[in-house]
């Protein structure tokens, strides 16, 4: 997951500017035993009556943890700037390069990721466009009506969000929000606990970190990447995201986590539904656009016509089908994925008007990639050209063995991604020493990449930064879902430890 729109409001704007309002609302909720709404800034955020406070009225561990995180973990842009300073000082202290030489190193690396950043930007936008199409939305809405019970609804929701997020994180985000809102509206009164529903949407997004749309495996599989020479060539997706080892790991998570959420759901008498206010907001129809052909100018008729985009889109999909048939899945790289998403998006939207409108909306998710990737590339230049990568590689070797190294990478990445929520962007600066240490220990590069990706998914479960789209869309607070996602975090840590300490890398 890369590049959340840095212009989005932080959850702290909703909560900590008016904490006293939330506390008063919480006390009122306890008195009347009903779900309530608390006003935070300009947004209404729903809360569960048995939310983060305990019976004595004290702030719970989840609320204190959330407050600490939101008070002290800044925006990712601040992190990358701070990392630049820290790495510069480390290189100055630990390598023979002086200040001007280090600035030269920084400049050498600054534009190394330019091509990759553009590729990721296109992938994020096109994935959003596919999920934002009318056929996908209408299909998801129809699927919501199939299950009848809270249990079956929650399991179905988790499975669909997990699968789509694994395929493409931006599409998974859209699917989670579209389906989640529809479920909240249509399944009121069946015992489906709203905080658990939102928590399950966010938690199942964790599977994206081990999917084929993630930065690390895509970078290693794409020709001309900056690591190609150091790792001895390209590493196909069949050795990383599509490897038997990682597929078994992801499949086990996919099939077990939904049942944990079922177990975490309270009884029907204690389950919390959305309020009437949120119900009205979720069901408000957008203004209808006048598309009567007789009222359109000739240019507008072409914009609304299905013919131009459909011809190009179908042609692209024929090429993709031929590519897979003749070259195989192992040859798929970032460019092929983007090409396929372009074609699918064109076919699903039909008209240029709909396609372009969706693209404009999806562009907002890419600002982090556009602005931050050059900064990460500059840090990469500092680490590689100054010799700092050799120093850090030695540190890793001093605490690792061939059996424990992959697990150490998992834990290291989990910790780093909690404090530096870059969504995989920082792989560019960590790859030189993480991969080099693994190579010296005889660990396959693909297995190191798999461990790195797995650590990223774990951190997201307890990091509120990436929860912002869910918090704003579903009108909840992070501490309302943290108790549930924290349980999944502990479970996933145990699974990852077993996988990378016990199971063979070549599974």
Regions found by a protein language model. Give the residues of each.
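Hydrophobic alpha-helical transmembrane segments of multi-pass integral membrane proteins
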Residues: 1, 146-179, 370-386, 397-436, ...
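Re-entrant/interfacial helical elements at transmembrane boundaries that shape
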Residues: 1-3, 12-17, 31-41, 138-141, ...
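Early transmembrane hairpin of solute transport permeases
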Residues: 1-4, 8, 113-225, 419
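Juxtamembrane helix-boundary/capping and inter-helix hinge elements in multi-pass membrane proteins
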Residues: 4-9, 21, 31-33, 41, ...
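Membrane-interfacial loop-to-helix junctions in multi-pass transporters
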Residues: 4-12, 75, 110-117, 144-156, ...
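Alpha-helical transmembrane segments of multi-pass membrane proteins
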Residues: 7-21, 150-165, 189-215, 234-238, ...
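Membrane-core helix-loop-helix motifs of multi-pass transport proteins
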Residues: 15-17, 179-273, 467-499
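Hydrophobic transmembrane alpha-helices of multi-pass small-molecule transporters
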Residues: 37-125, 242-255, 259-372, 487-491, ...
């Amino acid at each position: 997951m890369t590049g959340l729109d840095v212009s989005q409001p932080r959850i702290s704007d909703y909560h900590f500017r008016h904490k006293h309002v939330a506390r008063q609302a919480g006390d009122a909720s306890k008195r009347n035993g009903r779900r309530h709404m608390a006003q935070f800034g300009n947004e209404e955020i729903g809360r569960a009556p048995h939310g983060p406070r305990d019976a004595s009225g004290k702030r719970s561990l989840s609320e204190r943890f959330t407050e600490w995180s939101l008070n002290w973990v800044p925006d990712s842009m601040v992190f990358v700037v701070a990392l630049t300073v820290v790495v510069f000082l480390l290189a100055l202290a630990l390598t023979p390069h002086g200040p001007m030489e280090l600035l030269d190193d920084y400049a050498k690396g600054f534009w190394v990721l330019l091509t990759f950043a553009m590729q990721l930007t296109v992938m994020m936008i096109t994935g959003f466009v596919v999920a934002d199409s009318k056929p996908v939305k209408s299909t998801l809405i129809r699927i919501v009506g199939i299950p009848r019970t809270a249990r079956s609804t929650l399991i179905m929701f988790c499975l669909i969000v997990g699968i789509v997020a694994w395929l493409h994180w931006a599409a998974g985000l859209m699917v989670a929000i579209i389906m989640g809102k529809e479920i909240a509206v249509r399944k009121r009164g069946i015992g489906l606990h709203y905080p658990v529903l939102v928590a399950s949407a966010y938690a199942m997004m964790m599977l994206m970190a081990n999917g084929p749309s993630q930065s690390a495996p895509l970078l290693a599989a794409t020709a001309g990447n900056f690591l190609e020479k150091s790792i001895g060539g390209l590493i196909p997706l069949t050795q990383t995201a599509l490897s038997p080892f990682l597929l078994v790991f992801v499949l086990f998570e996919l099939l077990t986590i939904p049942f944990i959420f079922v177990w975490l759901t309270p009884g029907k008498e204690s389950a919390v539904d959305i309020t009437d206010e949120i119900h009205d907001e979720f069901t408000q129809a957008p203004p209808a656009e006048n598309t009567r052909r007789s009222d359109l100018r000739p240019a507008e008729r072409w914009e609304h016509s299905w013919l131009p985009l459909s011809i190009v889109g179908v042609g692209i999909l024929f090429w993709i089908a031929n590519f897979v048939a003749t070259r195989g899945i192992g040859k798929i790289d970032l460019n092929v994925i983007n090409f396929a998403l372009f074609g699918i998006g064109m076919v699903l939207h039909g008209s240029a008007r709909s396609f372009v409108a969706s693209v404009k909306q999806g562009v907002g998710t890419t600002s982090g990639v556009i602005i931050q990737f050059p900064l990460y590339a500059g840090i990469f230049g500092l680490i590689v050209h100054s010799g700092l990568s050799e120093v850090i590689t030695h540190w890793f070797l001093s605490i690792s063995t061939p059996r424990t190294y992959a697990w150490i990478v998992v834990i290291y990445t989990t910790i780093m991604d909690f404090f530096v929520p870059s969504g995989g962007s920082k792989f560019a600066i960590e790859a030189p020493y993480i991969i080099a240490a693994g190579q010296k220990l005889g660990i396959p590069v693909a297995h190191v990449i798999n461990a790195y990706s797995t650590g990223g998914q774990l951190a997201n479960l307890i990091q509120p930064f990436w929860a912002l789209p869910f918090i704003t869309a579903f009108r909840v607070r992070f501490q309302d879902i943290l108790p549930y996602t924290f349980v999944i975090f502990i479970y996933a840590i145990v699974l990852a430890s077993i996988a990378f300490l016990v199971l063979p890398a070549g599974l």
